[in-house]
From Swiss-Prot:
Chief subcellular location: cytoplasm
Similarity comment text for this entry: Belongs to the endoribonuclease YbeY family.
PROSITE patterns: UPF0054
UniProtKB keywords: Cytoplasm, Endonuclease, Hydrolase, Metal-binding, Nuclease, Ribosome biogenesis, rRNA processing, Zinc
UniProt name for this protein: Endoribonuclease YbeY
Cofactor note: Binds 1 zinc ion.
Length: 152
């Protein structure tokens, strides 16, 4: 029996588009053929994510997104990819303001991009570089974004 559980939380920031964001995440999961999931997404500020980044990665600095996968090693992998997600995504909305400026995109587009990125990592996808032209995971990420992009 498959589970579908998506929780959105907001820590130390204002975010008024939870319903649009919620629908976006469900659409991405559907595009990826994921119907069995327990996923929590926390939108936060730089202080919140920096504490977690320091605690779990020994990097005392903020970052855009952290993925925490709670899946046990299982036999449900298809070519190394897990279609059953159990984990948390922590996203610094404050950090995304800087990334969006750097990449010359709207902040909500960047939010959607890093959300997809985190979900792909929870599935087991990896990338060695940030080359959007050559890295399979990043090409997939951009294709999913094009198919599911929302206006906030």
């Amino acid at each position: 029996m498959s589970k579908s559980d998506l929780n959105l939380l907001v820590e130390n920031i204002k975010f008024e588009h939870l319903s649009i964001f919620y629908d976006f995440i469900l659409s991405v999961l559907n595009t990826l053929s994921i119907s069995d999931f327990e996923l929590s997404v926390i939108l936060c500020d730089n202080v919140y994510i920096q504490k977690l980044n320091n605690k779990f990665r020994n990097k005392n600095e903020p970052t855009d997104v952290l993925s925490f996968n709670y899946n046990e090693v299982n036999e449900d992998l298809v070519d190394g990819i897990n279609y059953k997600i159990q984990g948390d995504l922590i996203i610094s909305f404050e950090y995304l303001k800087f990334s969006a400026q750097e990449f010359n995109v709207e902040i909500y587009e960047e939010l959607q991009r890093v959300t997809i990125h985190g979900i792909l990592h929870l599935m087991g996808y990896k990338h060695e570089t940030n080359d959007f032209q050559k890295e399979g995971m990043l090409i997939l990420q951009e294709n999913i974004l094009r198919k599911n992009k929302r206006v906030f």
